[in-house]
């Protein structure tokens, strides 16, 4: 090992990349008292939003609430820079309610940079990291995590393009789309991590030399148009409907600026025909690139090819900031040549005279398949090396921020020689996402979805603090101020729920007749306010209107109380399921099992189980390649083995009794 006498500086943790994952990771480690350096290619593009300047949406908003509950910052910045807020899926149940904020991308970046600069223990450096410094012999074993791969080394630091070495006890890679990034417009390409910014070189080769598998993914972004050249009056306006809703649980941050409208237009037959006639000129259909793009954010070419029966597709026009005329054309990501993109835009109603400020482009980049990571987001091969964000194959600022926080927390615990914190999938969307990433061989950008969780009624945004803030406080990410806010809210909720469960109204009360008309059901004798609230169509607002509920309670308290009461039966059943899973996770597995003989297991599961010989069912469930079907088969096998063992004991006892009886021995 080199003595590193020429090292420029030494830190506890180095974070490589200044996007949403990197910022959360760096703030987390610094907050936990570790000297931290964040390296990025461009300090003027910290936490940049190169695609849609928006935060939240289905499942994504739940992630943002969870990050905030753990002391992260994405929710606070989304609230303070929001241009417009809307509640999605409002007509459906609370499990899928989603807050979405259109944000001011420049202001977001400015505020994040300021936050980083004001964070104690955190230093910022502008440089391209091209290599990793590795000690060949690992220092210690992985803590409380199962891995069939042996570590081959321990991270010591990083090396920059111009040869400077910086030492660190842990390194977190959050490189986004920059590793060997290449942007495409039509059949033309250039090396870039995103438009106007250079690609990162060297680090992919460094990872490959260490034995890591890397592959390629792609994403894309639509054109930007000058607002002043759009006929907004002819378009459908979408106003904010949730200015009083927030991602953060801190009431001191519940402030909204003046809201801006978005607008909606649609593709036309001219749009579709132009695309069909020129598919061969796009990077994908022209065969210039073959990397997988995000399934849930397809290009307009993909939409028209895959949904050829649809006559039109919605296109949303969204502002990029208060002080810029740039409009983001959501739904029109395209790989068409630049000269053809303006023609495409002008086929849309309201945009026939528009001016295009920035063309759409696709970006292709290297990523690290996350099956090479532990649930702590530490790599299996190299101790102290963590990976988070788009580098792990995800797409979205929210997914990146959540991973960054987890990687930062566990990097700090690694440095302090503490056990890693693992987020079970049944307790958070963070856990669901990481569980999916490390266990599934994903070959397309991963987006979090409510449908990916079996426990979505419990994993709501409104109760993210209840689920995660105690953990955040315990590990040091949540400060005393945030903890006090949490305790006050929970106390208010419990008091109000208790009151509603106890207070009754009688059928003879004057208010009863009005309530019967509202709820469509009669009151016989008397009813508690809680049972009244459980009736379809009855809400806290109904109780407030009749002065039966406390209107002075904050909105989040009132909504949380209503959800807890209204869905108490469902919540109880789902909590019971989770407890059963936890109980099963502690169940011991026999030692030295030949899993090859269990034919109901998949071939991959047999190989992984044989290689690791997990001690508990919970350890088996954490292994990549062991599916839910395999786990069910393993449980059935365990039950059969227990029955056989029990039957064998009975036969053995009967044989002993018979033997002693023949010998004339009394018991």
Curated annotation (Swiss-Prot):
Its cofactor is FAD. GO terms for cellular component: cytoplasm. Coiled coil: none annotated. FAD binds at residues 17-22. It is found in: Cytoplasm. Its main location: cytoplasm. Keywords: Cytoplasm, FAD, Flavoprotein, NAD, tRNA processing. InterPro entries: FAD/NAD-bd_sf, GIDA_C_N, MnmG, MnmG-rel, MnmG-rel_CS, MnmG_C, MnmG_C_subdom, MnmG_C_subdom_sf. It comes from the Bacteria. NAD(+) binds at residues 293-307. GO terms for molecular function: flavin adenine dinucleotide binding. NAD-binding protein involved in the addition of a carboxymethylaminomethyl (cmnm) group at the wobble position (U34) of certain tRNAs, forming tRNA-cmnm(5)s(2)U34. Homodimer. Heterotetramer of two MnmE and two MnmG subunits. This is tRNA uridine 5-carboxymethylaminomethyl modification enzyme MnmG.
